Amino acid sequence: MSKSLQAIRGMNDILPDQSPLWRYFEGTVAGLLDSYGYSQIRTPIVEFTELFKRSIGEVTDIVEKEMYTFQDNKDSLTLRPEGTAACVRAVLEHGIIGNGQVQKLWYVGPMFRHERPQLGRYRQFHQIGVEVFNLAGPDIDAELIMLTWRLWALLGIQDAVTLELNSLGTSEARARYRDALVEFLSQRIDQLDEDSQRRLKSNPLRILDSKNEGTQAALVGAPKLEEYLDEESRVHFEGVKARLDAAGIPFVINTKLVRGLDYYSKTVFEWVTDKLGAQGTVCAGGRYDGLVEQMGGKPTAGVGFAMGIERLLLLIETLGQVPESISRTIDVYLCAFGEQAELAGLKISEQLRDRLPNLRLAVNAGGGNFKNQFKKADKSGALFALILGDDELAKQEIGVKPLRGQGEQQNIAWDALAAHLETAIAQA
Protein backbone atom coordinates (compact mmCIF):
# COMPACT_ATOMS: atom_id res chain seq x y z
CA MET A 1 0.00 0.00 0.00
CA SER A 2 1.40 3.39 -0.99
CA LYS A 3 2.28 5.91 1.68
CA SER A 4 -0.34 8.64 2.09
CA LEU A 5 0.65 12.02 0.69
CA GLN A 6 1.59 14.56 3.34
CA ALA A 7 3.21 17.98 3.51
CA ILE A 8 6.99 17.99 3.80
CA ARG A 9 8.22 18.03 7.39
CA GLY A 10 8.66 21.61 8.55
CA MET A 11 6.47 23.01 5.75
CA ASN A 12 2.94 23.57 6.97
CA ASP A 13 -0.47 24.18 5.47
CA ILE A 14 -2.34 27.26 6.65
CA LEU A 15 -5.92 26.04 7.02
CA PRO A 16 -9.14 28.08 6.76
CA ASP A 17 -9.54 28.40 10.54
CA GLN A 18 -5.99 29.82 10.76
CA SER A 19 -6.21 32.20 7.80
CA PRO A 20 -8.19 34.99 9.54
CA LEU A 21 -5.35 35.54 12.02
CA TRP A 22 -2.80 35.64 9.18
CA ARG A 23 -4.93 38.12 7.25
CA TYR A 24 -5.41 40.28 10.34
CA PHE A 25 -1.67 40.32 11.04
CA GLU A 26 -0.59 40.98 7.46
CA GLY A 27 -3.27 43.63 7.03
CA THR A 28 -2.22 45.40 10.23
CA VAL A 29 1.44 45.46 9.17
CA ALA A 30 0.64 46.55 5.60
CA GLY A 31 -1.56 49.39 6.83
CA LEU A 32 1.13 50.60 9.22
CA LEU A 33 3.85 50.49 6.55
CA ASP A 34 1.60 52.38 4.14
CA SER A 35 1.09 55.06 6.79
CA TYR A 36 4.89 55.47 7.07
CA GLY A 37 5.30 55.82 3.30
CA TYR A 38 6.79 52.41 2.45
CA SER A 39 6.10 50.70 -0.91
CA GLN A 40 5.73 46.96 -1.47
CA ILE A 41 8.14 44.98 -3.65
CA ARG A 42 7.72 41.34 -4.72
CA THR A 43 10.66 39.18 -5.77
CA PRO A 44 10.86 35.52 -6.91
CA ILE A 45 11.29 32.79 -4.32
CA VAL A 46 14.07 31.22 -6.44
CA GLU A 47 17.35 33.03 -7.14
CA PHE A 48 20.78 32.09 -8.44
CA THR A 49 22.77 30.48 -5.61
CA GLU A 50 25.62 32.91 -6.19
CA LEU A 51 23.41 35.77 -4.97
CA PHE A 52 23.31 34.35 -1.45
CA LYS A 53 26.96 33.34 -1.42
CA ARG A 54 27.94 36.92 -2.25
CA SER A 55 25.51 38.58 0.14
CA ILE A 56 25.14 36.31 3.16
CA GLY A 57 28.71 34.96 3.02
CA GLU A 58 29.99 31.56 1.93
CA VAL A 59 31.16 30.56 5.41
CA THR A 60 27.87 31.18 7.21
CA ASP A 61 25.61 28.44 8.58
CA ILE A 62 22.88 29.46 6.14
CA VAL A 63 25.00 28.97 3.02
CA GLU A 64 26.96 25.99 4.30
CA LYS A 65 24.14 23.98 5.87
CA GLU A 66 20.66 25.40 5.46
CA MET A 67 19.93 26.39 1.85
CA TYR A 68 17.68 24.41 -0.48
CA THR A 69 19.82 24.36 -3.63
CA PHE A 70 19.32 22.45 -6.87
CA GLN A 71 20.69 22.29 -10.40
CA ASP A 72 18.68 23.62 -13.34
CA ASN A 73 20.68 22.57 -16.40
CA LYS A 74 23.99 24.37 -15.80
CA ASP A 75 22.61 26.84 -13.25
CA SER A 76 22.67 26.44 -9.47
CA LEU A 77 19.42 27.79 -8.02
CA THR A 78 18.32 28.29 -4.41
CA LEU A 79 15.03 28.82 -2.62
CA ARG A 80 15.51 32.15 -0.86
CA PRO A 81 16.56 31.75 2.80
CA GLU A 82 16.01 35.46 3.53
CA GLY A 83 14.69 38.53 1.74
CA THR A 84 17.35 41.25 1.83
CA ALA A 85 19.64 39.81 -0.85
CA ALA A 86 16.81 39.44 -3.37
CA CYS A 87 15.60 42.97 -2.63
CA VAL A 88 19.09 44.39 -3.23
CA ARG A 89 19.40 42.38 -6.43
CA ALA A 90 16.05 43.75 -7.63
CA VAL A 91 16.79 47.43 -6.96
CA LEU A 92 20.18 47.09 -8.66
CA GLU A 93 18.81 45.21 -11.66
CA HIS A 94 16.06 47.77 -12.25
CA GLY A 95 18.17 50.82 -11.46
CA ILE A 96 15.86 52.36 -8.87
CA ILE A 97 18.48 53.42 -6.30
CA GLY A 98 20.88 55.23 -8.65
CA ASN A 99 21.89 58.86 -8.12
CA GLY A 100 21.04 58.72 -4.44
CA GLN A 101 17.39 57.88 -5.03
CA VAL A 102 15.76 56.95 -1.71
CA GLN A 103 13.71 53.76 -1.66
CA LYS A 104 11.66 52.63 1.36
CA LEU A 105 10.44 49.12 0.55
CA TRP A 106 8.68 46.20 2.21
CA TYR A 107 7.91 42.62 1.24
CA VAL A 108 6.10 39.57 2.56
CA GLY A 109 6.45 35.93 1.64
CA PRO A 110 7.87 32.48 2.36
CA MET A 111 11.56 31.79 3.06
CA PHE A 112 13.24 28.38 3.16
CA ARG A 113 15.95 26.91 5.37
CA HIS A 114 16.85 23.26 5.94
CA GLU A 115 16.71 23.32 9.73
CA ARG A 116 15.44 20.92 12.37
CA PRO A 117 11.74 21.80 12.75
CA GLN A 118 10.60 22.79 16.24
CA LEU A 119 8.15 25.18 17.85
CA GLY A 120 8.56 28.54 16.13
CA ARG A 121 11.18 27.26 13.65
CA TYR A 122 10.21 25.76 10.31
CA ARG A 123 11.76 24.83 6.97
CA GLN A 124 9.28 27.01 5.15
CA PHE A 125 8.54 30.11 7.18
CA HIS A 126 7.12 33.52 6.39
CA GLN A 127 8.63 36.93 6.91
CA ILE A 128 7.67 40.55 6.50
CA GLY A 129 10.75 42.60 5.76
CA VAL A 130 11.61 46.28 5.30
CA GLU A 131 14.60 47.67 3.39
CA VAL A 132 15.61 51.34 3.04
CA PHE A 133 18.28 52.58 0.62
CA ASN A 134 20.26 55.83 0.40
CA LEU A 135 19.55 57.10 3.91
CA ALA A 136 22.71 56.98 6.03
CA GLY A 137 21.76 58.77 9.26
CA PRO A 138 20.65 57.43 12.63
CA ASP A 139 17.17 58.89 12.09
CA ILE A 140 16.08 56.14 9.70
CA ASP A 141 17.51 53.42 11.99
CA ALA A 142 15.37 54.87 14.77
CA GLU A 143 12.33 55.13 12.50
CA LEU A 144 12.44 51.40 11.76
CA ILE A 145 12.57 50.62 15.46
CA MET A 146 9.79 53.12 16.25
CA LEU A 147 7.67 51.56 13.49
CA THR A 148 8.01 48.10 15.03
CA TRP A 149 7.31 49.50 18.51
CA ARG A 150 4.05 50.95 17.20
CA LEU A 151 3.21 47.61 15.59
CA TRP A 152 3.67 45.74 18.87
CA ALA A 153 1.21 48.16 20.48
CA LEU A 154 -1.35 47.59 17.71
CA LEU A 155 -1.01 43.82 18.17
CA GLY A 156 -1.22 43.97 21.97
CA ILE A 157 2.23 42.43 22.55
CA GLN A 158 4.29 45.51 23.46
CA ASP A 159 4.77 44.45 27.08
CA ALA A 160 6.08 41.01 26.06
CA VAL A 161 9.02 42.09 23.88
CA THR A 162 12.37 43.70 24.67
CA LEU A 163 14.57 45.69 22.30
CA GLU A 164 18.24 44.65 22.27
CA LEU A 165 20.64 47.04 20.57
CA ASN A 166 24.30 47.06 19.53
CA SER A 167 26.71 48.65 17.07
CA LEU A 168 29.08 46.55 14.96
CA GLY A 169 30.99 49.57 13.68
CA THR A 170 32.44 49.87 10.19
CA SER A 171 34.08 46.96 8.38
CA GLU A 172 37.51 48.40 9.29
CA ALA A 173 36.62 48.58 12.99
CA ARG A 174 35.25 45.04 12.92
CA ALA A 175 38.43 43.78 11.25
CA ARG A 176 40.54 45.22 14.09
CA TYR A 177 38.22 43.71 16.67
CA ARG A 178 38.13 40.36 14.85
CA ASP A 179 41.92 40.13 15.00
CA ALA A 180 41.92 40.87 18.73
CA LEU A 181 39.14 38.35 19.42
CA VAL A 182 40.85 35.61 17.40
CA GLU A 183 44.12 36.19 19.25
CA PHE A 184 42.30 35.97 22.60
CA LEU A 185 40.31 32.83 21.77
CA SER A 186 43.18 31.04 20.05
CA GLN A 187 44.78 30.72 23.48
CA ARG A 188 41.58 29.05 24.77
CA ILE A 189 40.64 26.99 21.74
CA ASP A 190 40.29 23.77 23.73
CA GLN A 191 37.47 25.40 25.74
CA LEU A 192 35.42 26.17 22.61
CA ASP A 193 32.71 23.88 21.27
CA GLU A 194 33.18 22.35 17.82
CA ASP A 195 31.06 24.95 16.00
CA SER A 196 32.95 27.81 17.64
CA GLN A 197 36.31 26.27 16.76
CA ARG A 198 35.21 26.21 13.13
CA ARG A 199 33.92 29.78 13.32
CA LEU A 200 37.20 30.99 14.81
CA LYS A 201 38.68 30.70 11.31
CA SER A 202 35.67 31.80 9.28
CA ASN A 203 33.30 34.06 11.27
CA PRO A 204 34.68 34.63 14.79
CA LEU A 205 32.14 37.29 15.78
CA ARG A 206 29.41 34.64 15.71
CA ILE A 207 31.15 32.96 18.65
CA LEU A 208 29.92 35.83 20.83
CA ASP A 209 26.29 34.65 20.66
CA SER A 210 27.08 30.96 21.17
CA LYS A 211 24.71 29.25 23.61
CA ASN A 212 27.39 26.73 24.67
CA GLU A 213 28.30 27.16 28.35
CA GLY A 214 31.95 26.22 27.85
CA THR A 215 32.33 28.73 25.05
CA GLN A 216 30.66 31.44 27.12
CA ALA A 217 33.11 30.69 29.95
CA ALA A 218 36.01 31.03 27.49
CA LEU A 219 34.70 34.46 26.48
CA VAL A 220 35.05 35.87 30.01
CA GLY A 221 37.58 38.68 29.79
CA ALA A 222 37.50 38.76 25.98
CA PRO A 223 38.02 42.08 24.16
CA LYS A 224 34.78 44.04 23.77
CA LEU A 225 33.56 45.29 20.43
CA GLU A 226 32.68 48.75 21.73
CA GLU A 227 36.35 49.28 22.62
CA TYR A 228 37.18 49.08 18.91
CA LEU A 229 34.35 51.22 17.55
CA ASP A 230 35.39 54.01 15.20
CA GLU A 231 34.26 57.56 15.96
CA GLU A 232 31.79 57.63 13.04
CA SER A 233 29.99 54.52 14.33
CA ARG A 234 30.07 55.79 17.90
CA VAL A 235 28.41 59.08 16.93
CA HIS A 236 25.87 57.23 14.77
CA PHE A 237 24.98 54.87 17.62
CA GLU A 238 24.58 57.73 20.09
CA GLY A 239 22.21 59.34 17.58
CA VAL A 240 20.08 56.20 17.42
CA LYS A 241 19.91 55.90 21.20
CA ALA A 242 19.05 59.58 21.63
CA ARG A 243 16.11 59.27 19.24
CA LEU A 244 14.81 56.15 20.97
CA ASP A 245 15.06 57.92 24.32
CA ALA A 246 13.16 60.88 22.88
CA ALA A 247 10.45 58.54 21.59
CA GLY A 248 10.18 56.79 24.97
CA ILE A 249 11.24 53.39 23.63
CA PRO A 250 13.14 51.32 26.21
CA PHE A 251 16.14 49.28 25.07
CA VAL A 252 18.94 47.12 26.41
CA ILE A 253 22.51 47.28 25.08
CA ASN A 254 23.65 43.75 24.23
CA THR A 255 27.34 43.84 23.32
CA LYS A 256 27.19 40.20 22.17
CA LEU A 257 24.50 40.91 19.59
CA VAL A 258 26.23 40.37 16.24
CA ARG A 259 23.49 38.94 13.94
CA GLY A 260 23.95 35.82 11.82
CA LEU A 261 24.57 37.46 8.45
CA ASP A 262 27.91 38.84 7.29
CA TYR A 263 26.60 42.01 5.70
CA TYR A 264 25.57 43.94 8.83
CA SER A 265 27.46 47.04 10.04
CA LYS A 266 26.91 49.80 12.60
CA THR A 267 23.40 49.51 14.14
CA VAL A 268 21.99 46.03 14.77
CA PHE A 269 18.89 45.23 16.81
CA GLU A 270 16.60 42.40 17.85
CA TRP A 271 13.17 42.29 19.44
CA VAL A 272 13.11 39.30 21.80
CA THR A 273 10.54 37.67 24.05
CA ASP A 274 10.75 35.16 26.89
CA LYS A 275 7.27 33.80 26.15
CA LEU A 276 8.24 31.35 23.37
CA GLY A 277 11.04 29.31 24.89
CA ALA A 278 14.23 28.98 22.85
CA GLN A 279 12.86 30.77 19.79
CA GLY A 280 12.86 34.18 21.41
CA THR A 281 13.73 36.51 18.51
CA VAL A 282 10.61 37.78 16.72
CA CYS A 283 12.14 40.63 14.70
CA ALA A 284 15.73 41.53 13.83
CA GLY A 285 17.63 43.87 11.59
CA GLY A 286 20.26 46.52 11.22
CA ARG A 287 22.39 48.54 8.87
CA TYR A 288 24.25 47.08 5.86
CA ASP A 289 26.02 50.01 4.20
CA GLY A 290 28.48 47.82 2.28
CA LEU A 291 26.09 45.25 0.84
CA VAL A 292 25.01 47.04 -2.35
CA GLU A 293 28.63 47.65 -3.32
CA GLN A 294 29.48 44.06 -2.41
CA MET A 295 26.83 42.94 -4.91
CA GLY A 296 28.13 45.07 -7.75
CA GLY A 297 26.51 48.46 -7.14
CA LYS A 298 27.85 51.81 -6.04
CA PRO A 299 28.42 52.52 -2.33
CA THR A 300 24.89 52.82 -0.95
CA ALA A 301 23.55 53.17 2.57
CA GLY A 302 21.12 50.43 3.53
CA VAL A 303 19.15 49.42 6.60
CA GLY A 304 16.29 47.02 7.23
CA PHE A 305 14.65 44.35 9.35
CA ALA A 306 12.65 41.15 9.03
CA MET A 307 10.02 39.72 11.35
CA GLY A 308 8.94 36.09 11.55
CA ILE A 309 5.21 35.81 11.03
CA GLU A 310 4.78 32.35 12.57
CA ARG A 311 6.57 33.35 15.77
CA LEU A 312 4.62 36.58 16.11
CA LEU A 313 1.30 34.79 15.57
CA LEU A 314 2.34 32.25 18.20
CA LEU A 315 3.13 35.10 20.58
CA ILE A 316 -0.21 36.80 19.88
CA GLU A 317 -2.03 33.52 20.62
CA THR A 318 0.09 32.79 23.71
CA LEU A 319 -0.78 36.20 25.15
CA GLY A 320 -4.49 35.86 24.30
CA GLN A 321 -4.40 38.88 21.99
CA VAL A 322 -6.32 37.39 19.05
CA PRO A 323 -9.19 39.84 18.36
CA GLU A 324 -12.56 38.16 18.81
CA SER A 325 -13.90 39.80 15.65
CA ILE A 326 -11.48 38.02 13.30
CA SER A 327 -12.85 34.59 14.20
CA ARG A 328 -16.10 35.55 12.44
CA THR A 329 -15.83 35.31 8.66
CA ILE A 330 -19.54 35.79 7.88
CA ASP A 331 -21.86 38.56 9.07
CA VAL A 332 -25.14 37.40 7.52
CA TYR A 333 -26.44 34.03 6.25
CA LEU A 334 -29.43 34.03 3.90
CA CYS A 335 -31.87 31.10 4.11
CA ALA A 336 -34.43 30.77 1.29
CA PHE A 337 -37.25 28.20 1.11
CA GLY A 338 -38.69 27.33 -2.28
CA GLU A 339 -37.62 28.14 -5.82
CA GLN A 340 -39.21 31.59 -5.97
CA ALA A 341 -37.67 32.53 -2.63
CA GLU A 342 -34.26 31.33 -3.83
CA LEU A 343 -34.50 33.51 -6.96
CA ALA A 344 -35.61 36.53 -4.92
CA GLY A 345 -32.88 35.81 -2.38
CA LEU A 346 -30.19 35.93 -5.05
CA LYS A 347 -31.44 39.32 -6.22
CA ILE A 348 -31.64 40.67 -2.66
CA SER A 349 -28.15 39.40 -1.82
CA GLU A 350 -26.59 41.13 -4.83
CA GLN A 351 -28.41 44.37 -3.99
CA LEU A 352 -27.01 44.13 -0.46
CA ARG A 353 -23.49 43.66 -1.85
CA ASP A 354 -23.99 46.80 -3.98
CA ARG A 355 -25.13 48.84 -0.98
CA LEU A 356 -22.74 47.35 1.60
CA PRO A 357 -19.46 46.39 -0.13
CA ASN A 358 -17.85 45.26 3.13
CA LEU A 359 -20.75 43.03 4.16
CA ARG A 360 -19.75 39.37 4.50
CA LEU A 361 -22.84 37.58 3.21
CA ALA A 362 -23.28 33.86 2.58
CA VAL A 363 -26.26 32.56 0.61
CA ASN A 364 -27.38 29.04 1.42
CA ALA A 365 -26.51 26.57 -1.31
CA GLY A 366 -27.75 23.01 -1.68
CA GLY A 367 -31.34 23.57 -0.54
CA GLY A 368 -32.65 21.99 2.64
CA ASN A 369 -35.59 22.49 4.99
CA PHE A 370 -35.82 25.23 7.61
CA LYS A 371 -34.10 23.22 10.33
CA ASN A 372 -31.25 22.21 8.03
CA GLN A 373 -30.61 25.71 6.67
CA PHE A 374 -30.91 27.34 10.07
CA LYS A 375 -28.39 24.88 11.49
CA LYS A 376 -25.94 25.82 8.73
CA ALA A 377 -26.55 29.51 9.42
CA ASP A 378 -25.74 29.05 13.10
CA LYS A 379 -22.66 26.94 12.36
CA SER A 380 -21.32 29.58 9.96
CA GLY A 381 -20.73 31.96 12.86
CA ALA A 382 -22.91 34.65 11.29
CA LEU A 383 -24.44 37.35 13.46
CA PHE A 384 -27.80 37.25 11.67
CA ALA A 385 -29.84 34.84 9.57
CA LEU A 386 -32.03 36.26 6.81
CA ILE A 387 -35.18 34.19 6.37
CA LEU A 388 -37.09 34.29 3.10
CA GLY A 389 -40.11 32.09 2.43
CA ASP A 390 -43.54 32.36 0.77
CA ASP A 391 -44.99 34.62 3.50
CA GLU A 392 -42.06 37.03 3.30
CA LEU A 393 -42.21 37.03 -0.51
CA ALA A 394 -45.86 38.02 -0.47
CA LYS A 395 -45.15 41.00 1.79
CA GLN A 396 -41.77 41.88 0.19
CA GLU A 397 -40.18 41.51 3.59
CA ILE A 398 -37.38 39.38 4.98
CA GLY A 399 -36.93 37.96 8.46
CA VAL A 400 -33.80 39.13 10.28
CA LYS A 401 -33.06 36.72 13.11
CA PRO A 402 -30.18 37.44 15.53
CA LEU A 403 -28.03 34.35 16.10
CA ARG A 404 -25.83 35.59 18.93
CA GLY A 405 -28.39 36.77 21.47
CA GLN A 406 -28.93 40.31 20.13
CA GLY A 407 -32.72 40.38 20.48
CA GLU A 408 -35.81 39.02 18.71
CA GLN A 409 -36.45 38.36 15.03
CA GLN A 410 -37.79 41.30 13.01
CA ASN A 411 -39.41 41.44 9.60
CA ILE A 412 -37.83 44.19 7.49
CA ALA A 413 -38.97 45.59 4.14
CA TRP A 414 -36.60 44.76 1.28
CA ASP A 415 -35.82 48.41 0.54
CA ALA A 416 -34.93 49.06 4.20
CA LEU A 417 -32.81 45.93 4.68
CA ALA A 418 -29.38 47.39 3.88
CA ALA A 419 -29.75 50.27 6.33
CA HIS A 420 -31.09 47.95 9.03
CA LEU A 421 -28.21 45.48 8.66
CA GLU A 422 -25.59 48.21 8.62
CA THR A 423 -26.84 49.51 11.98
CA ALA A 424 -27.46 46.09 13.52
CA ILE A 425 -24.00 44.74 12.62
CA ALA A 426 -22.30 47.87 13.95
CA GLN A 427 -24.12 47.42 17.27
CA ALA A 428 -23.62 43.65 17.55
Swiss-Prot record:
GO terms for cellular component: cytoplasm. It comes from Pseudomonas entomophila (strain L48). GO terms for molecular function: ATP binding; histidine-tRNA ligase activity. InterPro entries: aa-tRNA-synth_II (IPR006195), aa-tRNA-synth_II/BPL/LPL (IPR045864), Anticodon-bd (IPR004154), Anticodon-bd_dom_sf (IPR036621), His-tRNA-ligase (IPR015807), HisRS-like_core (IPR041715), HisRS/HisZ (IPR004516), HisRS_anticodon (IPR033656). It holds the Pfam family HGTP_anticodon. Its main location: cytoplasm. GO terms for biological process: histidyl-tRNA aminoacylation. Keywords: Aminoacyl-tRNA synthetase, ATP-binding, Cytoplasm, Ligase, Nucleotide-binding, Protein biosynthesis. SUPFAM superfamilies: Class II aaRS ABD-related, Class II aaRS and biotin synthetases. Belongs to the class-II aminoacyl-tRNA synthetase family. This is Histidine--tRNA ligase. It is found in: Cytoplasm.
